[in-house]
Amino acid sequence: MSKRNTPQRRHNILALLSEQGEVSVDALAKRFATSEVTIRKDLAALETNGLLLRRYGGAVPVP
């Protein structure tokens, strides 16, 4: 996905998190065919906005 698709990817990450309860960086990178670094940046941005909590290797929903 290109930079213009970043908001859509982040939206999809939140949808997956809602469905699964937990997501891993590795699985997200494979699913979206992007690097783990990109996924970590996405998770960091979403955490900054209070939308999830990052954990080692992934993320969980905000309680």
Each model region followed by its residue ranges:
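HTH-adjacent hinge/linker in prokaryotic transcriptional regulators
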Residues: 2-37, 41-63
